[in-house]
């Protein structure tokens, strides 16, 4: 069974100017529902999602490892421009663009992920939390408007306490929203455990249940990257 993702661009309230369909997964269960997208200042559409099969998009060609993630660009007329990949166990949770057309994607990953540019060429490798197969580590990747890889950051959450009765620690850092404005990029996220971004350390919060069981409290943060 093939899974399809569809996009519609509107110039007016009820009139679609173009539509596009991407076939990126073999099954519906591998398809990312509610995948983030954005529109840049020139009217180009930046879309994201998951892929579990080879994807040909304009001159880009992406091959997956596990359930990989992609970011792709359509121009304002709906023509395919390029697609870049996060090859490995990865999910894009947020996307934004700045005034120059640069594109920022943030999300979660596990193990080893290869960052591919808009030609499908590997440009960098990121490593998640060691020994953890769940997507608890986070990435932020910057691409140029032409799909060139510019830079990346990795956030690896760490267990902050190990009290008796703590149970199985489960630190994580989950991006929710990216905003690029006035030359800066802001990230909204939730986290458990300690996470370090540049020189900023986000400290985990904990509560005790009847004084016997200590557990992580999910905490929200907005940080400037």
Please identify what each model-predicted range represents.
Residues 1-6:
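Bacterial N-terminal signal peptides
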Residues 11-225:
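A sequence-level/structural motif corresponding to short, flexible coil/turn segments enriched
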């Amino acid at each position: 069974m093939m899974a399809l993702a569809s996009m519609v661009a509107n110039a007016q309230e009820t009139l679609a100017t173009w539509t596009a369909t991407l076939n990126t997964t073999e099954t519906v269960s591998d398809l990312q529902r509610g995948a983030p997208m954005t529109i840049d200042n020139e009217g180009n559409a930046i879309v994201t999602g998951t892929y579990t099969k080879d994807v040909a998009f304009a001159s880009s060609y992406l091959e997956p490892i596990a359930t990989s993630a992609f970011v792709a660009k359509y121009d304002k007329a709906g023509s395919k421009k390029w697609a870049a990949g996060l090859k490995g166990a990865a999910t894009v949770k947020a996307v934004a663009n700045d005034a120059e057309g640069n594109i920022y994607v943030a999300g979660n990953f596990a193990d080893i992920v290869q960052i591919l540019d808009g030609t499908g060429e590997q440009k960098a490798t990121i490593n998640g939390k060691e020994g953890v197969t769940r997507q608890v580590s986070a990435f932020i990747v910057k691409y140029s408007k032409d799909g060139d890889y510019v830079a990346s950051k990795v956030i690896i959450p760490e267990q902050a306490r190990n009290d008796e009765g703590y149970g199985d620690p489960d630190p994580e850092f989950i991006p929710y929203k990216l905003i690029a404005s006035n030359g800066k990029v802001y990230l909204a996220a939730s986290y458990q455990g300690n996470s370090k971004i540049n020189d900023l350390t986000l400290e985990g919060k904990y509560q005790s249940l009847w004084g016997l069981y200590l557990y992580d409290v999910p905490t929200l943060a907005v940080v400037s990257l």
